[in-house]
Amino acid sequence: ANQITMEEKEKAWKPVSSKYLFRRPWLTVRCEDMLLPNGNHIPEYYILEYPDWVNTIAITKDGKFVFVRQYRPGLGRTSYELCAGVCDKEDASPLVSAQRELWEETGYGKGNWQEYMVISANPSTHTNLTHCFLATDVEPIDHQHLEDTEDLSVHLLTFEEVKQLLENNEIMQSLNAAPLWKYVAEHAADFEQESVEKVEHEKTETISHRINDLLYYQNSISRSLSRFLKDEEVET
């Protein structure tokens, strides 16, 4: 975590009093009586305490993006999402949490991992951070190990399909959209170049096939003409 700056110290709100209203494994709510540096007073300010979260942009060896699709009761919608979850207390690090979640939800693993970015869902009220990882060359190593609260399917999407989902606002989870947009911005040119090279390769192959076909027909005609001339000579 970044060190607190002098500006942050000067602008920090000071809790006069604090009390917990709600405690659950995945959510704790506390109410604070806040005093602002400008002298203003907020008698009820609610803070939501969460464990840190993780998500992963997982890409297979052949360039497919590993997504899950599941129903979200908050919005009442089904959506494509990155594999994500909570940092358990038993996990040694956010990286371990991300690798565990990918294995549990999709059965994918191995590959090359790096922390891609760290973001906050809502710094106004949330205490936690989300650690976003990039994992390349992942591969299926097992079946899913879903919890009782999970009901999701695994989908492999191309770069263009992911980009289209983002542009159509079909990836609604902001903690997913942020690292995905970053990845698209950084790698769009690479994929466009690959697409151009693929098209050029296909054109070259098509031309090559047509030339081979023409040569075949030309040889066939030559052989037929040769046989015809020989037959004419025999008759003569």
What kind of region is each of these model predictions?
Residues 10-12, 45-50, 55-100, 138, ...:
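Conserved Nudix-box catalytic region and its N-terminal flanking loop in Nudix hydrolases
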Residues 19-55, 61:
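Acidic, metal-coordinating catalytic segment for phosphate/diphosphate chemistry
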Residues 33-38, 122-142, 155:
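Active-site-adjacent beta-strand/loop module that shapes the phosphate/pyrophosphate-binding cleft
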Residues 15, 19-21, 116:
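Local beta-strand/beta-hairpin segments that build beta-sheet-rich folds
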Residues 15, 29-31, 42-44, 68, ...:
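Hydrophobic residues on conserved beta-strands that form the core of alpha/beta folds
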Residues 4-13, 78, 115, 124, ...:
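Nudix hydrolase/Nudix homology domain
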